[in-house]
Amino acid sequence: MAPRSRTCWMAVAALGALIVLALVAVACGSDSSSTTSAATDPVRPSVTVSLPTPSTTVNQATAVQLAMSDLTRLAPAASQTDLLSAAASMQAFGVDLYRVLKNTTGDKNLVFSPSSIVTALAMTYAGAGGSTAQEMAATLHFHLEGDALHQAFNSLDAALESVNFEQKDPEGHQVGVLIKTANSLWGQRDLAFEKLFLDTLAADYGAGIRLVDCKTAAEKARQAINAWVADQTDDKIPELVPQGALDSLTRLVLVNAIYLHATWMAQFDPGSTKDGAFTTAAGATVTARMMRQTFSFPYGKGDGWQAVQLPYLGGKVALMVIVPDKGRFAEVESRLALDSPGATGVSAPSTGGLIDQAVASLGEGTEVDLTLPKFQFRTQAGLKDALVALGMKSAFGPEADFSGMTKQESLSISDVIHEAYIAVDEEGTEAAAATAVIMRATGMPAQPLQLIVDRPFIFALRDLETGALLFLGRVTDPTA
């Protein structure tokens, strides 16, 4: 991205918001030279998967030949109930994952994208069977089955992209909201993939197939995947898949990327930004750049915390900031997943604990004198251990059942890699995140209410119409 100027509008939740999920399947069985040429799902006659030869498309930057399927994505058709169920799954899984990650990151800042991670794993789930599918459904809080689940994610993706718009402000600067999502499938060129699996990816996720050769050119395949991720994330995630992550046993990589760029409905005046003290989670005092403005924000409070919601232009997406009282951050943070049933509670979607409490507390608008630090950081994390801890165990072992992907070889997940980036300034937010799953074989007061965010806080970037949790994290040190 070019250096930011007044003519380059900022993205929601930070300088840039992007989430990418990559899944690589690695074979545990024998090799075969058979290829997939065409596949048609009888349930979806409008979708035809046609795989051209690897020479069809060449990535000039990496000299890797990529064959892309000509896939037709179905129009969104899920009911509102199913759409909200998919969004609830993202929130329930997000708070579960937050609980695990916060215990492994210490006092550090944290950001990740439940939306990106769940979408990528939903694509993986399309090829799962037996106990592997059951564990994934429980861990991801899926309460829909079969086509209904994947159609719900298709409709949710369309709902998120429908908020996009761009306009010029009174000074002639471009402002707006941009949420861009993309899915792709990278497969070993001589592996026969099941047609129903490919059709589901095509119809409900818009994911084409790129044929690569990890058996003899794993590094070139890695470079091609990273180039695609970098392009989808405006170069915020330049190298999602690290060296050595792909090898001759790699058979499949599923990638999801989300990029969010949005302008505040009420921008902060840069002239009002001053240095200010911020007490970190470790108890140290650092000097942060503190933005300040008075505006009518949705505001609420509960036991030991206050919440304020900063909407982006259009009013459909917002960043909610939950600010625990001084000395109560750990206590309040522990309530984030208080109501979440975890991997064993599959009877109903989680209520999300603290997030839902904060949302319910928000009034229509309260005049708030808000002081908020600017921040910019990224989180890189391997999610294998976290997913196993949440109940998704068999997917990573030799007993994994991904026979819905291919009958030719036995596949299991070897790792899940996630990277997220977020930046928040006076104009708005931009964020980026990437995940790779690697598979082996109330009333307005007379005076403004003052809220000075000078201590650790939790943030949730949400789509207000569906409740989809796009980004979730915490800021314990805005200068880190």
Region locations from a protein language model:
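Short, ordered coil/turn segments that flank beta-strands lining enzyme active or ligand-binding pockets
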Residues: 26, 281, 426, 464-465
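Charge-patterned, phosphorylation-rich low-complexity C-terminal interaction regions
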Residues: 39, 335-337
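Non-catalytic, conformational "gating/processing" segments within enzyme and secreted inhibitor domains
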Residues: 61-64, 107, 145-333, 352-445
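Extended hydrophobic
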Residues: 254, 306-322, 446-480
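N-terminal secretory signal peptides that target proteins for export/translocation
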Residues: 1-9
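Conserved structured core elements
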Residues: 87, 91, 111-115, 130, ...
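Detector for small/aliphatic-rich hydrophobic stretches
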Residues: 3, 16, 20, 26-214
